[in-house]
Amino acid sequence: MSNTPDQPMVPSSQVPESVVVFELDGTEVTVTDDGLTLLEALRGPLGVHSVKDGCAPQGQCGCCTVLVDGTARVACVTPLRRVSGRSVTTFDGLDSAVRSEWATAFVDHGASQCGFCSPGIVVRLEALRTKAAVSPAGADGLRDGAVERALAAHLCRCTGWQSIVDAATEVLGGSGAEVAVELHGPNDSSRDLDAAARRATLELGAPQVIGADVVAGAVGFSADTAPDGCLVAVVDPDGSWVLGESVVAARRAAGKVQGRRTTVDPVPPLEVPDGDWDLTLRTGWVDAAYVETDAAWCEPGGEPSRAAANGGAFGAKRHSPLPKVAQDLANEHGRAVLALWSREDCSRSAPKRPPIAAGIRADGTGVLRVVATDGIVEKIAAVAPGVEVIEVEVAGPPTSVTLRAAGWAEAVVLIAGIGAPSDVVSVEPATGISPERVVVRTTDGAVAAASVTAAGIVVHVQAGAALD
């Protein structure tokens, strides 16, 4: 069921309509403001798509970071009226040479994967460079840990921090990676970005491209590429789809205030089975926490766009319902429709890792209770054949084995933690020169080894020949 776009709008605030004038990427712009955030204005009437909506209005993911008079700000919690008469710079407004420099460094170091969070990260790091340049010490004014502190305002679930830190170190200077690596930029003739994309696609199990456009966030995300003039569909508090002529109009028609805090305690839903166990483990409803929220658009009679434009989502979007929703609504209303989930919608409705509660003995036998999920028993048995797996029906969010290593990783933790014999997991004891190592071998031949030292956690991965 869906509501039509001509229903009376429910205003989200009592702010009277006014006009806000400010400088955007070097050009003066005028926007009618009736309580908009800066992000809503940028992505709406101003059409700036390098600024992403990953969590609005939580102000936590950093994907909407812009410069306001040179200072990094998250646009989703900045009222539009606050930038009146000021200068706003997005990723698109950075000098082309600066954008190219960052793109080269990010591609060099593998600091982007899907690219959704990259433009906002680059903007904040560029603000860090500007801040250092005006300090008395110049570039040397970047103190140790400055990049890491800047990144604390961002969530990137794909690459891990180190590759981003290394890219920033290359651009900003300072202490970089401990091991020197010969790197080549995206325009280097020795690079094969198509091969890199094939490798990334193999690793992710979903199509992915590699290149400068990824760093710019310009890889065809559905929320960015929907046709001009399309209807926007969002979910109301009752779970029905409500349509409007824009994201703001649809959300106001839905009458739903986006949440910023949960009221649910993170308590694992299953109890550990009775028994005399050497090791136990309980997990809750673990969300994949991908930053690009589910979105898909479709023309009447056409095929919908993909919910995951450039990999990402850790397998959680493999069966996203939004492409089918967009297709059905487009056919129903005879217009292109963009179906859009908010961060809250993803948290409520996207699939989670199946929660488990398990006990295991030193010989590798035990009992593992898991929320009933198609295919989960086979995933766990492949790692822990001596563990009895019991599926339990539990009310809660959807679960799926398509999430990266769902069930499999939890079983690995149990087997490795107890040191039980396994064809998948082995524990190599410490020697005089090497710490204890846990080695994991997948069924398709990949090998990973991890050890804990005083300096940190050391991980080695062998996953086939590097294609690029």
Placement of each model-derived feature along the sequence:
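Glycine-rich beta-alpha junction loops
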Residues: 59, 80, 121, 431, ...
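Extracytoplasmic/cell-surface-exposed regions of Actinobacterial cell-envelope-associated
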Residues: 24-30, 74-75, 95-97
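Polybasic, low-complexity association/targeting segments
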Residues: 10-17, 60-71
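Short glycine/serine/threonine-rich phosphate/pyrophosphate-binding segments
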Residues: 59-60, 73, 119-124, 316
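Ferredoxin-type iron-sulfur electron-transfer modules in oxidoreductases and energy-metabolism complexes
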Residues: 35-49, 77-195
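Glycine-rich phosphate/adenylate-binding loop and adjacent beta-alpha elements
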Residues: 66, 71-82
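Cofactor-binding beta-sheet edge motifs in enzyme active sites
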Residues: 2-3, 7-9, 15-33, 48-49, ...
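A basic, amphipathic helix-loop patch mediating RNA/tRNA/ribosome contacts
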Residues: 33-68
